[in-house]
């Protein structure tokens, strides 16, 4: 039961950190390449 409580307290923290970093990454990509349908570093 103690392991379950530890899991339930760790999982929201990790998911919050993950989604916050993912949102920040998407915001920075959209700031550097606004309205980009194709990214210049992918087209060779």
Swiss-Prot record:
Pfam families: PSI_PsaJ. The chain crosses the membrane at residues 7-27. It is found in: Plastid, Chloroplast thylakoid membrane. The keyword NAD does not apply. GO terms for cellular component: chloroplast thylakoid membrane; photosystem I. Keywords: Chloroplast, Membrane, Photosynthesis, Photosystem I, Plastid, Thylakoid, Transmembrane, Transmembrane helix. May help in the organization of the PsaE and PsaF subunits. PANTHER family: PHOTOSYSTEM I REACTION CENTER SUBUNIT IX, PTHR36082. This is Photosystem I reaction center subunit IX. The gene is psaJ.
